[in-house]
């Protein structure tokens, strides 16, 4: 990943060659641009991957680039596919399962510093 900064105090994150992590089997994460208030993360999930039910104080906006997932937010479950988006309010329990290989873009506010 290459980060370029100019005098105007903004940065461009080039994702070609980005450093990725595998926080758990079946999940690959790449982190894009971030600031004190925002963080963009790309997640790729293998079919059959199921994340643990969890919550965090960050508001999370999710855009599904490709694939098919089942999402549970609080007690409501729904399915999402490529082109769909949704918001998970901060401190709300949620969980995702990949019904097929899937790729999502997540935007968190404030920044999830543990992803950096």
Write out the residue ranges for each language-model feature.
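A short, N-terminal "cap"/entry segment at the start of jelly-roll beta-barrel domains
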Residues: 1-37
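Anionic, Ser/Thr-rich low-complexity intrinsically disordered regions
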Residues: 21, 41, 73, 105-106, ...
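Conserved short histidine dyad/triad with adjacent acidic residue
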Residues: 41-55
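Short beta-strand segments in beta-sandwich/barrel cores
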Residues: 50-51, 67-72, 86
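Glycine- and acidic-residue-biased ligand/ion/polar-headgroup-sensing regions
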Residues: 58-69, 74
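A cytosolic small-molecule/anion-sensing beta-strand core signal
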Residues: 65-66, 81-82, 100
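Short acidic-glycine-tyrosine-enriched beta hairpin
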Residues: 75-90
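Ligand-binding loop in jelly-roll beta-barrel domains
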Residues: 90-114
């Amino acid at each position: 990943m290459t980060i370029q900064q100019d005098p105007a105090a903004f940065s461009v994150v080039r994702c070609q060659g980005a450093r990725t992590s595998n926080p758990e089997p079946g999940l690959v994460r790449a982190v894009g641009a971030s600031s004190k208030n925002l963080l963009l993360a790309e997640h790729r999930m293998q079919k059959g991957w199921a994340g643990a039910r969890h919550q965090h104080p960050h508001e999370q906006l999710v855009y599904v680039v490709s694939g098919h997932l089942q999402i549970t937010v609080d007690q409501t479950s729904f399915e999402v596919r490529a082109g769909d988006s949704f918001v998970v309010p901060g401190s709300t329990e949620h969980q995702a399962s990949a019904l097929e290989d899937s790729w999502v873009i997540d935007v968190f506010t404030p920044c999830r510093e543990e992803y950096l």
